Amino acid sequence: MSSPTVALPQRLVSLDQFRGYTVLGMFLVNYVGGFVVVPEVLKHHNDYCSYADVIMPQFLFAVGFAFRMTFERRVQREGLAPAYGRVVKRLAGLALVSMVVYGASSPAETWKQLVDLGPLAALAPALKRNWFQTLMHIAATSLWILPVIRAGIGVRLIFALASAILHVFLSWQFNFEWCNTSPNAIDGGPLGFLTWSIPAIIGTVACDWVRMPDSRTPWLRMIVVSTVLMVVGWGVSCGTRFYDVPAERMEELKDVVLAENPVLPAGDQLKYRGLAEAPFVQPPPKAERKWNYWMMSQRAGTLSYLTFSAGFSLLVYVFFHFVCDKLRWEFGLFRLFGTNALISYILHSMVMGAIKPFVPRDAPVWYVAGSLLLFFSIMWLFVRYLERNKVFLRL
């Protein structure tokens, strides 16, 4: 017997607030990440999970939550087949938007070079890197979980587990090394949706829990599940210690980035060397530990990274659910950007492009902070203007 649920409002305050916080976090880390004075924890890294790296999984968590919340309404309103068809068309539209927003680098300088490359080789760099960023991953992941979006929690969790196992297998076959060879993939590349489905499906589960009557809201369960996911993600990342370089081989391997057998370590690599560093703690440099599948890597979309980040996203959302839906607190800045997240995402790259050319990488902290404030102010002006004129971009 399924648990009783309550109808949620058209817009859930906690979800908008959570999304707005995530948008502002994205503004921060995307703007400051290239400056020398900024702490490493605010920068994106390819070999561990920093604060910057937990931002994108929160978007996928919010996508899964909203998808679960709105799709059933659409089915009830339009019928099953029209609802599925409409979602597929909207996801195709989002994929097209992502291709336009991200663009692509030119694969050839002359017509002859383009003809010699052929269509597949010409499109390969864009498919591997340029197009598969946040918006495309949202579209691909949403399409991937669409068959189970109406299923029970158990089915969805099994689907997430199967997707994770498939990602490990394909990474062992080719995908991990492919993502880390030029041109390097972004956010897991074309197969990243397999592990991005983890935070998305946890978002759908959170939606089910929030829909329970107040007296049955499983606060403890949400906190325990978020903690378990974070611990499991960190535990999986401890496999990275198999790839510590012995002291006598550091000089020999100092220029090598990727480990031998980066997914399934060979027998002589299976030596216990202790636990991995905690998330948000920088690991040893590549001369001391080679890159491998078990480290937390946004570039490769690794299992440990997205399992930990799914738990972290759930814990952050629980905070907003309590503060906003139970205590009835609401923060205007989070509401502003949370209700118009897509246009905020598209605009922020343009605004950064107008400001950052005038901020050298080695600028002092006061100059970086001032330019960051200018960036936030311009974004606020643009998005506030759109809100006042009731202009919202949603797909």
Where are these regions (language model features)?
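Alpha-helical transmembrane segments and their immediate juxtamembrane cytosolic regions
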Residues: M1-L395
